């Protein structure tokens, strides 16, 4: 039985003793042979102990660690589906995701998430002991895995207020890896680190899976730590590094940054949001090129790349489409628009998701004749460079995390003392953006009580930083809240205060 998508089996045959993974904290290293052996053993363990089979779902609630890559290897071999879940979410949020994905097994890290109190019925097992499978040797696990079989369900916050599970197939991972390698010159000699969380596509699929697909080496960090990251870049002599502007700003503000030589980096990849020109120049002054790009969970995610030589000349651009990515910019009637005319950005290619888990309506609404509708307004200039004019309608990005106001509003409106609520993103010096909530009270309640309530029901990054009470929320003729005008008025009054 042939499984084309078993990457670790292939590399275990080509370069068995090459280091594929290194844990930044403990220094533990894993070769491609060890990963392949462990992935086989885990596959048999999951089948024999839990009767898991192709198509079954496993949730992972954990900080970054090497065991998650071993489970990824098992998923490639078995055809099971991994469901990474943000360990910063509240119990109610996690229960919704577990129920929606119908996971039968939940693996968690004891130090980062307390599963006690979760009402969802499943088998709960600590993830840490899975690392011991590296000492096992098992025969190759055999299963017919096809390109359209899912390997991930990655949840994104939905505009309806409920998260949607984006299906990731083996085909998507393959073509995203090829696109990334062609754009960023990734090969078996590539060495990088990953500090992006593995509950997002950015953690798995911006660099981690493309580098492992091509036989390179990854240094794994549990979480971002500016000082440790800078130290690792130097000590490991990395080829490239990926981070969001907030991370790069924190690194650049370290006292030792100015005296540290990082000119050996081929480039730094920037995602999540646009990088300010002064920050670009800080890295350029250290002879480190900057590669900005654009991506979405539903499409790979790596879609475009701005070559480092254009970083300042085309500042604000997301670059040009990657090799096997097709783009259109369309008007409201789905007609193609000429250069410099803003319209909705549509994407096509083999790295586009087949749809959302158990959500045919959302899947249908997101596509048109094979094109994925990003919901982002963009334009293409005369040279073919793309620019995002506006993000998805109301979403804001706080420290690299996408926050959908309607999700926060849904929680706020469940409180008996709140009659109306509007949330939007406002500038924040450290996190890029944070949330501001305008509240119409039904009963007496303080901003501190609202914040405490949110902390119990939402991830910390979703909790509004500013809470203001108003008498009423203005609405348009159709009864809809005019968020754009409301935010504009709020910002003007805030600036004048």
What is the meaning of each model-derived region?
Residues 238-243, 252-313, 326:
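Gly/Ser/Thr-rich phosphate-binding loop
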Residues 111-148, 162:
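ANL superfamily adenylate-forming
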Residues 29-33, 151-175:
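Conserved AMP-binding A3 loop
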Residues 174-191, 199-240, 250, 254:
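Conserved AMP-binding/adenylation subdomain of ANL enzymes
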Residues 16-17, 137-155, 162, 185-191:
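Conserved pre-ATP/AMP-binding loop-to-beta segment of ANL
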Residues 44, 68, 89, 349, ...:
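AMP-binding/adenylate-forming catalytic core of the ANL superfamily
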Residues 45-89, 402:
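Conserved AMP-binding/adenylate-forming
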Residues 304, 320-324, 335-366, 401-403:
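Conserved ATP/PPi-binding loop(s) of AMP-dependent carboxylate-activating enzymes
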